[in-house]
Amino acid sequence: MEEDWEQHGEKEEVPLPAKKPDANKWDGEDEEEEVKDSWEDEDELEEKKDEEKVETPKAKPKKTLQQKIVEKEKQKHEEAERRRLEKEAENMTPEQKLAEKLRLQKLQEESDLKNALDTFGVTTLAGGIDGMTPNTKEDFVELSDAIVKKLASYKSDPEYADFLEDLVTKLFAGLPSNNIRKVKGILDNLYLEKQKLEKGDKPKKSKGGKVKARLKLDGENQNFDEYQPKYDDFDEYDDFM
């Protein structure tokens, strides 16, 4: 019996036939395709493409009807002003045309300056008389001192006296007669004191024993209150102005 098992074991093993490929399948069909880990990679590519696209410029907002009306009215006004100036220029003398040209040039320069200040965020010019906006008595005193200081630099000019006469006339032309009379009295006293100083007279003592203050020839900020008159004493000077 043992011999039969040994003989059976010694028999050669018959190899199994190789499996034939399925004729219905294409070559390489069984190979696994490379699958992307996720769809996020594809989304990122799409976003990059969108960013690379040139943005289309947005169309300018259309003007409203009200804006168009305002703009049209402005154009009409400018055209009417231009025609008026042209008509006036036809009747002007050469001197008047030159003066008008200088006036327009000055206006243009002021407009350019204002635009430049607006561009840089400057609202007003710093300091100086132009920057003052007096409201109180102290403010007007400060303005007065600034004007006197400004004009003092021209007092040695030969035309200075004529300039002051013209300036005073223009300044007081619009004031009531009472104000003019008050200033007239101050000038009368100032004139008398000036005369005494120029002649070398000594100041007279008043009843109280005090010497009346002299006028400072070289001072810029003189106090003219001490020269204010009593108006009843100056009726004889009513024809001064």
Swiss-Prot record:
Pfam families with a match to the protein in the record: eIF3_subunit
Localisation: Cytoplasm
Family: Belongs to the eIF-3 subunit J family.
Single annotated GO MF: translation initiation factor activity
InterPro entries: eIF3-like_dom_sf, eIF3j
Function recorded in the entry: Component of the eukaryotic translation initiation factor 3 (eIF-3) complex, which is involved in protein synthesis of a specialized repertoire of mRNAs and, together with other initiation factors, stimulates binding of mRNA and methionyl-tRNAi to the 40S ribosome. The eIF-3 complex specifically targets and initiates translation of a subset of mRNAs involved in cell proliferation.
Keyword Transmembrane recorded: no
Protein name as catalogued: Eukaryotic translation initiation factor 3 subunit J
Coiled-coil ranges (or none): 31-119
